[in-house]
A protein has these predicted regions:
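A detector for short, charged/polar N-terminal pre-domain segments
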Residues: 1-11, 67
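Short, Lys/Arg- and Gly-enriched loop/turn segments at beta-strand edges
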Residues: 64-71
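A basic, amphipathic helix-loop patch mediating RNA/tRNA/ribosome contacts
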Residues: 9-51
Length: 71
């Protein structure tokens, strides 16, 4: 499992996918989320604006990513 480190209290799911270079565009992230291809903490998430916080686990395209905070 890879770790994605953020420097804010939370990051929106769509922004996290772009920030971690898992997708190349926001439009691609939006479509993948709406198609149900992304899970958050083991549950399908269709909300691209969902707040992802440190400790959350995002799974996409066979990979799992945990979110950590660093200031």
């Amino acid at each position: 499992m890879e770790t994605i480190t953020i420097t804010t209290e939370f990051i929106k799911l769509q922004d996290l996918l772009k920030f971690a270079n898992l997708v190349s565009t926001g439009g691609e992230a939006k479509q993948l989320i709406l198609d149900g291809q992304v899970t958050v903490n083991g549950e399908e998430c269709l909300m691209r604006g969902k707040k992802i916080r440190p400790g959350d686990v995002v799974a996409f395209d066979g990979g799992e990513y945990t979110v950590a905070y660093e200031d």
